[in-house]
Amino acid sequence: MKQTANLTLLICVFLCLGNKAQAQVFLKSEYISPSKFKDKNGNKLRGKGDLKTIDGGIRIPVCIKMDENNKPIAWAIALTGTYASLGNKDISKDYATSEILNAQVGVMHVRPLNEKWSILATLGAGIYTSNLDKISGKSILGQGGILFIGHAKPNFDWGVGVAINNALGYPMIFPSFYLDWRLGGIYDFKLSMYDSFQLSLSSQINDNFKLSIVGESKGLMSAVEKDGKNMYFVSQYGYAGIQPEYKIAKDLAVYATGGVSLTRDTYFQSRTLKAFYKSEDNYPHFGVSAYFSVGIKYGF
């Protein structure tokens, strides 16, 4: 099974706080236009579908203080959520559901170990469901982890650790990895990998306007019951596009993205250990589609 973005708490959101003592809020809406549906062998099946999402979150620093090396010791609370509507037309229920809700709340703590290393610990829970009318205990997952972060250079951080969740109905420990690489100059380059893959190349046109080429791979999942069995429904997609961003106040900005969704897999997976570690070369998927999004963010 491909590990989706929501199997572990979004640890990387806390790293965005840095030494900022203010809250961060974001709201984003995405649209992927309709495209033909194909099986895992690439054969076109009857039907097509689109995807619409609303994604938002708030991160509140509860306590931040700096040590003697000017590195943060901090506690924070984060609440994030995504609602996705899958506009499936003439697609069998064997391949897709009509909606997904992923919502997480967590408490996070970071502290430096020395000048080169920090430790980040998280503890939280989330709801992962495709049935908003009846949210069962099986769709509520606990999650947490410990990540050791190495500050190799001022623009390069990497980390290793462990994550724990009850995605299979009982606690399991998984390895976790983190990478954040930034390059400045005429163009700003950023590569980030933890729960999702993010890539951007940006140019600051003036004090208020920034233009970027962006790419991201992300995923959603829900705990479902299918044919009397406990399963997960997984939707994973990636996109690349042009993103203009305009700062309308000191800490407030709006942005929009237009581009292409390169891939969007949708499939059901058994909620078992064997299925979790099983990985297919290809999954049932939608074809290449147009991608659009708009968003607003504060405090970033």
Regions found by a protein language model. Give the residues of each.
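Residue-level signature of outer-membrane beta-barrel architecture
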Residues: 60-64, 109-111, 150, 181, ...
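Membrane-embedded beta-strand positions of outer-membrane beta-barrel proteins
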Residues: 27-29, 75-79, 121-123, 160, ...
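Outer-membrane beta-barrel translocator/channel fold
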Residues: 37, 194-292
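Repeated loop/turn-to-beta-strand initiation elements of outer-membrane beta-barrel proteins
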Residues: 65-68, 116-119, 154-160, 186-189, ...
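Residues that define the transmembrane beta-barrel architecture of outer-membrane proteins
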Residues: 48-54, 97-103, 136-142, 171-175, ...
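Transmembrane beta-strands of outer-membrane beta-barrel pores
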Residues: 29-35, 79-87, 125-131, 164-168, ...
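Outer-membrane beta-barrel "beta-signal"
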Residues: 176-182, 244, 285-300
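Transmembrane beta-barrel domains of bacterial outer-membrane proteins
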Residues: 24-133, 141, 233-236
